[in-house]
């Protein structure tokens, strides 16, 4: 329920938004929610490079004279006027009601009017202010929203080679990741991933390859094939004494929508090699059989549901098949995938849907139906580390927040280290993939 009395210490007394810069040097929106007792909750909206067509709308100004059209003054104005007026004197602890009020105020299916970035920044700032007002860490406040009693530390998906839309190189597959599953704590898993990251740098240098990094902090060398990215990572794992397939598994984010043209999957970096839907599925199946790949994200185009069905039938019992562009954190679309037995996991991105409450709806719908959940950053990030708290507070099981460099990525890992020390939540490692036989 909303609080009626304006002197309630948890009443919202002001909301302020501003333009800030994200990790790619593009504007994004940051919002402050200020309570009657002076408590401030602050949050920023991230931004993606490869985006699903059914994501909620990120409102940009389109004014080419400012930030090349990417300014967010309209979104800022929407927060400082319409959203502020609608939420003044409301009880900040009424997360669902506040999110519902913003959704109703917008009045569109994909938040066209106010912008998902405007709504999300306020939604997350509300949660942070509410947590502070109750003297709760954010992860615990999020857990309490859905009566999540057991907290776990997530297995990190560490993006150590960038390609596709995240780098200016010859690699088509967007992300090559490692998942340190064979460890007893998050801190030890993070250490292993960091050691492999530095080992990979030395492997690349020894082969005369570029060690500059992409949007998410992974290395972005020009390679002869996508498979070569896997082989250099395997060398890096071995070089520091870990066992691939036991201590460390591999994961891919193909972002296949980005190279799907006219019904064909075209690998430009491999001489425009072309596959039909079944052919590219078989290509991925072959990689998963040859290498210790535990997870494949967006292996097919978001509209290629027949291809997804085929891929799920081929390896869905052995490999985690993650829908990102496929599901866009939308409970209705996820339900369709569940009904059709498409994929077996969902990537969770706040800004694809636009509120914390809707994000939680997607997470718990997935959990209820046996789908794995991976909390994710975007390629355009800020120092905001809310996703770390979300991963723990929902016991999501996995988190995807980039490589082991760039402070916008490391901020999330560091927050997880703080949480682990504070709550001593368990790190389940390989048990997070217990449904897979591979």
Curated annotation (Swiss-Prot):
CDD domains in UniProt: enolase
UniProt-recorded Gene Ontology molecular function terms: magnesium ion binding; phosphopyruvate hydratase activity
Entry EC number(s): 4.2.1.11
Cofactor(s) needed: Mg(2+)
Enzyme's top EC category: lyase
Pfam families recorded: Enolase_C (PF00113), Enolase_N (PF03952)
InterPro entries, sorted: Enolase, Enolase-like_C_sf, Enolase-like_N, Enolase_C, Enolase_CS, Enolase_N
GO CC annotation: cell surface; extracellular region; phosphopyruvate hydratase complex
Biological processes, Gene Ontology terms: glycolytic process
Catalytic activity: (2R)-2-phosphoglycerate = phosphoenolpyruvate + H2O
Residues at which Mg(2+) binds: 253, 297, 324
Pathway assigned in UniProt: Carbohydrate degradation; glycolysis; pyruvate from D-glyceraldehyde 3-phosphate: step 4/5
Residues engaged in binding (2R)-2-phosphoglycerate: 174, 349, 378-379, 400
Entry-linked PROSITE patterns: ENOLASE (PS00164)
Active-site feature positions: 216, 349
Cofactor remark from the record: Binds a second Mg(2+) ion via substrate during catalysis.
Subcellular locations according to the entry: Cytoplasm; Secreted; Cell surface
Keywords linked to the UniProt accession: Cytoplasm, Glycolysis, Lyase, Magnesium, Metal-binding, Secreted
Subunit (UniProt): Component of the RNA degradosome, a multiprotein complex involved in RNA processing and mRNA degradation.
The protein's role, per its UniProt record: Catalyzes the reversible conversion of 2-phosphoglycerate (2-PG) into phosphoenolpyruvate (PEP). It is essential for the degradation of carbohydrates via glycolysis.
Similarity comment: Belongs to the enolase family.
Descriptive protein name: Enolase
Species per Swiss-Prot/TrEMBL record: Psychrobacter arcticus (strain DSM 17307 / VKM B-2377 / 273-4)
């Amino acid at each position: 329920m909303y609080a009626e009395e304006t002197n309630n210490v948890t009443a919202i007394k002001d909301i302020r938004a501003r333009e800030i810069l994200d990790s790619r040097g593009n504007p994004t929106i940051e919002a402050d929610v200020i309570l009657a007792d002076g408590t401030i909750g602050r949050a920023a909206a991230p931004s993606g490079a490869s985006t699903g067509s059914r994501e909620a709308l990120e409102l940009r100004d389109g004014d080419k004279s400012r930030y090349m059209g990417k300014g967010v003054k309209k979104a800022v104005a929407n927060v400082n006027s319409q959203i502020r007026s609608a939420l003044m004197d409301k009880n900040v602890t009424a997360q669902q009601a506040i999110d519902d009020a913003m959704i109703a105020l917008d009045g569109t299916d994909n938040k066209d009017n106010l912008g998902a970035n405007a709504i999300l920044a306020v939604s997350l700032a509300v949660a942070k202010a509410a947590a502070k007002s109750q003297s709760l860490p954010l992860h615990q406040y999020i857990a309490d929203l859905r009566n999540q009693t057991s907290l776990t530390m997530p297995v990190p998906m560490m993006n150590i080679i960038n390609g596709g839309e995240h780098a200016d190189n010859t690699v088509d597959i967007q992300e090559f990741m490692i998942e340190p599953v064979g460890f007893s704590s998050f801190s030890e898993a993070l250490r292993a991933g960091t050691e492999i990251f530095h080992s990979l740098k030395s492997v690349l240098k020894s082969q005369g390859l570029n060690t500059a990094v992409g949007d998410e902090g992974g290395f972005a060398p020009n390679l002869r094939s996508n498979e070569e990215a896997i082989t250099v990572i395997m060398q890096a794992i071995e070089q520091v004494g870990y066992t691939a397939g036991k201590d460390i598994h591999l994961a891919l984010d193909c972002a296949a929508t980005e190279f799907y043209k006219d019904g064909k999957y075209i690998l430009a970096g491999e001489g425009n090699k072309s596959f039909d839907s079944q052919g590219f599925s078989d290509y991925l199946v072959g990689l998963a059989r040859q290498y210790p790949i535990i997870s494949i994200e967006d292996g097919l185009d978001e509209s290629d549901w027949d291809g997804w069905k085929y891929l799920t039938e081929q390896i869905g019992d052995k490999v985690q098949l993650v829908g990102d562009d496929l599901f866009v954190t939308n409970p209705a679309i996820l339900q369709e995938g569940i009904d059709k037995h498409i994929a077996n996991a969902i990537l969770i991105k706040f800004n694809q849907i636009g509120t914390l409450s809707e994000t939680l709806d997607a997470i718990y719908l997935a959990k209820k139906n046996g789908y794995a959940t991976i909390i994710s950053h975007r390629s355009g990030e800020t120092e905001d580390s809310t996703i770390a708290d979300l991963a723990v507070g929902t016991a999501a099981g996995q988190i995807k927040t980039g490589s082991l460099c760039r402070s916008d990525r490391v901020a999330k890992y560091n927050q997880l280290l703080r949480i682990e020390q504070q709550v001593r939540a368990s790190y389940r490692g390989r048990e997070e993939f217990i449904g897979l036989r591979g």
